[in-house]
Amino acid sequence: MRLAVLVPVVVCSLALVGTAGASQLIARNASNISLQVNSNGKALITYRAGRRVTHLIAWGAINARPRPASPSGPRQVKLKLDYSGGWGPWRKLIWKHFKNACQPYDGPELAWFVTACRAPNGSYWALQSWQTALPDLGFVPWMKKQRTWWLHLSHWSGPLPQLEVYQDWVYSGRFQRIFGRYTYKGRGVRGFGTTHFGAPTDSYGRLVFVDTHNSVYGAGWMRENSFVSSGPPGLFCYGFYPFDPLVNGYAHPPGTTHRKRGPGTGDMYRLTATGPGVTPDVSWQGPGLHPYDPNNPSDVEHEHEMNAKLTEIKAGWHKCHAG
């Protein structure tokens, strides 16, 4: 779903440390990747990471649970993973005699696509890979782990999660902002809490990552920030402001000073959200806004329209105010 609309929204962003599990992280910097699924609902993922070839067996989860009423409820679904090719749980290397029954993929288009197929029962398995751990605020990665490409595995049937995105200006047009909602089967994707710096603390919380293109950070795509969707609507809002890299837990290279970075406004933005449960990661991409002109009737009208859209999305939720 691609929407590029404007509306005054309040910024409720936090620097985030770490990432939440989703789809499901199975490897880093993998190559020579293949996916097979048998008639018993088990997937075999073969890949090379460094000098090692791994035959991973995955099974036991599909889609995502709705968030329960309290944190004491059941945990979010999670695939079982055996990196020994079957020896661990079954005491035999089932990968050597694995009978693939998966058919060519005919499901919805996926972001960060590597490979996918349709299982005999009609469900889908997919692999996606993207640089999940890039540092925020447009820093060029200075550690190897920040440059890694994470390989995510998903298993689902039915609709994908939906990432609905709008744009507006805030503080009398001085800054740009992105807002919207992240939903799955009509319900907001949300957890029960975050750390002081905004990282999810439970298996239901999910992160939305924002990349900016051709910004003050440099040419091409750079990681701007990440945040959780919250509340019954699965609401999120993020303002492109200058940020002090030494405040709020941002990772930063040695020698970084308190000099603010940004605003990270660009000519395009890309949002990627990790899928709830073991559903696929989803992404949105669209052009950024031009500088706000209070004398331009079109800009003023867009602000009013987006104010109304934000109020509609919030549905009484207390975060993200028009501004």
Question: Where in the sequence are the language-model features?
Answer:
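Bacterial N-terminal signal peptides
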Residues: 4-15
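N-terminal signal peptide c-region/cleavage motif recognized by signal peptidases
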Residues: 17-19
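Extracellular, repeat-based ectodomains that mediate carbohydrate processing or recognition
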Residues: 21-323
